[in-house]
């Protein structure tokens, strides 16, 4: 044995493989205020104890690897390692456990959602000792969240920019999502905004295709916004999708939107990536643009109950990375979303301080220390009959977005917008008068339809449309 080997051996190095739980399962550990905490739903392979599975997650998402290594002796593992500090069974699920893991703050680069996710979920999800793994929640300590800018502006600043208070905002996604020329697209934008909507929207996959290049779309939409504003006296906007193949091209599109004088741009934050999103959010704050976020691809990550990542984690990540709006499901429409779960992450988007509440899927108390809030956007398969429920569920600080529920009106786009605006104003007035929208909502809509032919026609066309499927994402 060489002197060098003897020296290493003398300080305790022993080659080989040992159980993760001997190092990374520490039930006696007291979490620190500066720790990032994670709740993982763990499904171990048969024969793997839950303590070993939880410790493996902590190890592989922090300092560990499959064998002991010489260089462990060159640093302080106790300072840098993740620790599985608690494990509890999942009620009603065989061989599933919630493993709680604490990560020291020094493991993560400041202001980088990209680095945070690369560490915590970047590699461990393919680990063979686990049949499945899902990240249910994260606790972001103030000492880390304060390293992020967060949303470019936030809810209150947006309301001040738009001069709109006391009600949800109304939007519409232009349909068909693909195939329209830029001029016809701009026409639809104008008609919807003139009819009473606050916003219209590019669909998530509208970027710069052969049938409609981005610059042409931006110009025609800006013209539509200006014309609708002049006719209605209200501030209007269209979510111009700046998502592109490179960050440089994305910023170029945002710069052109600013030069046109429009109030808001849009980004697909999951397909575009967190680094691109944070870059765009910084540009938007510096240049007075609101930022609408679409969550395209989220269901690939969050829909399965035992594997992936819950949307509440993606919502927290977006609040740190930056966005003024984000799509959040509807509860009542065509897209996935159970009520208590949805309201849990809606609060995580909007509020400053959110208490732990397992009945709504919130595993940790979260303190955002005055980071601006994000408006949830309810969009997907909704129409005028849903308006009372949406107003009651989401409250004023939200965007209610009707695509087919506007453009599918039998009389055209502008009447469809009128119908939605009348329905919303009726629901807000009824709520302010103390009426119970959950119980009296349909009657409120019927009463309003007596005074609005556009609303009456919408009520007739969509009276039988429902999306009654059980939610997959249940507590």
From Swiss-Prot:
The keyword Signal does not apply. Its EC number is 4.1.1.39. GO terms for molecular function: magnesium ion binding; monooxygenase activity; ribulose-bisphosphate carboxylase activity. Binds 1 Mg(2+) ion per subunit. One of its GO terms (biological process) is photorespiration. The modification N6,N6,N6-trimethyllysine is found at residue 14. SUPFAM superfamilies: RuBisCo, C-terminal domain (SSF51649), RuBisCO, large subunit, small (N-terminal) domain (SSF54966). The modification N6-carboxylysine is found at residue 201. The modification N-acetylproline is found at residue 3. It catalyses: 2 (2R)-3-phosphoglycerate + 2 H(+) = D-ribulose 1,5-bisphosphate + CO2 + H2O; D-ribulose 1,5-bisphosphate + O2 = 2-phosphoglycolate + (2R)-3-phosphoglycerate + 2 H(+). Its cofactor is Mg(2+). It is found in: Plastid, Chloroplast. The disulfide bond which can form in the large chain dimeric partners within the hexadecamer appears to be associated with oxidative stress and protein turnover. The active site is at residues 175, 294. Substrate binds at residues 123, 173, 177, 295, 327, 379. Mg(2+) binds at residues 201, 203-204. The record marks 334 as: Transition state stabilizer. GO terms for cellular component: chloroplast. Residues 1-2 form a propeptide. The basic functional RuBisCO is composed of a large chain homodimer in a 'head-to-tail' conformation. In form I RuBisCO this homodimer is arranged in a barrel-like tetramer with the small subunits forming a tetrameric 'cap' on each end of the 'barrel'. Belongs to the RuBisCO large chain family. Type I subfamily. Heterohexadecamer of 8 large chains and 8 small chains; disulfide-linked. The disulfide link is formed within the large subunit homodimers. RuBisCO catalyzes two reactions: the carboxylation of D-ribulose 1,5-bisphosphate, the primary event in carbon dioxide fixation, as well as the oxidative fragmentation of the pentose substrate in the photorespiration process. Both reactions occur simultaneously and in competition at the same active site. HAMAP family: RuBisCO_L_type1. This is Ribulose bisphosphate carboxylase large chain. It comes from Pinus krempfii (Krempf's pine).
């Amino acid at each position: 044995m060489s002197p060098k080997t003897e020296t290493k051996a003398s300080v305790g190095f022993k080659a080989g493989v040992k159980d993760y739980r001997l190092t990374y399962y520490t039930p006696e550990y007291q979490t620190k205020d500066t720790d990032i905490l994670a709740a993982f739903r763990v499904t171990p392979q048969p024969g793997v104890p839950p303590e070993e599975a939880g410790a493996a997650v902590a190890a592989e998402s922090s300092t560990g690897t499959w064998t002991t290594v010489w260089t462990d002796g060159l640093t302080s593992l106790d300072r840098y390692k993740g620790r599985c500090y608690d494990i509890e069974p999942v009620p009603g699920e065989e061989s599933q456990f919630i493993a709680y893991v604490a990560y020291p703050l020094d493991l993560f680069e400041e202001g980088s959602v990209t680095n945070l996710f690369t560490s915590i979920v970047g590699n461990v999800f393919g680990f063979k000792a686990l049949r499945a793994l899902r990240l249910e929640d994260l606790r972001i300590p103030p000492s880390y969240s304060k390293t992020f800018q967060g949303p470019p502006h936030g809810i209150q600043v947006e309301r001040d920019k738009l001069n709109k208070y006391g009600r949800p905002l109304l939007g519409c996604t232009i349909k068909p999502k693909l195939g329209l020329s830029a001029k016809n697209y701009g026409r639809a934008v104008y008609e919807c905004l003139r009819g009473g909507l606050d916003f219209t929207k590019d669909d998530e996959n509208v970027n710069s295709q052969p049938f409609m290049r981005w610059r042409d779309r931006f110009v025609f939409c800006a013209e539509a916004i200006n014309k609708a504003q002049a006719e209605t006296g209200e501030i209007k906007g269209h979510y111009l999708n700046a998502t592109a193949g490179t960050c440089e091209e994305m910023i170029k599109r945002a710069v052109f939107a600013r030069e046109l004088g429009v109030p808001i741009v849009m980004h697909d934050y999951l397909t575009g990536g967190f680094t691109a999103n944070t870059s765009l959010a910084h540009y938007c704050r510096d240049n007075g643009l609101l930022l609408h976020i679409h969550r395209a691809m989220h269901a690939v990550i969050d829909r399965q109950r035992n594997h992936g990542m819950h949307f509440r984690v993606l919502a927290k990540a977006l609040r740190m990375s930056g966005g003024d709006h984000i799509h959040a499901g509807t509860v009542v429409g065509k897209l996935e979303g159970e009520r208590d779960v949805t309201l849990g992450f809606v609060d995580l988007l909007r509020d400053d301080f959110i208490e732990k509440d397992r009945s709504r899927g919130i595993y940790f108390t979260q303190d955002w220390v005055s980071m601006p809030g994000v408006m949830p956007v309810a969009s997907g398969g909704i129409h005028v009959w849903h308006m009372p429920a949406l107003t009651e569920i989401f409250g004023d600080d939200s965007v209610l977005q009707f695509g087919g529920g506007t453009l599918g009106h039998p009389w055209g786009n502008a009447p469809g917008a009128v119908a939605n605006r009348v329905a919303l104003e009726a629901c807000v007035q009824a709520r302010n008068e103390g009426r119970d929208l959950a119980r009296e909502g349909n009657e409120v809509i019927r009463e309003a339809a007596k005074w609005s032919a556009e609303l009456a026609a919408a009520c007739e066309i969509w009276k039988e449309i429902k999306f009654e499927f059980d939610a997959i994402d249940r507590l």
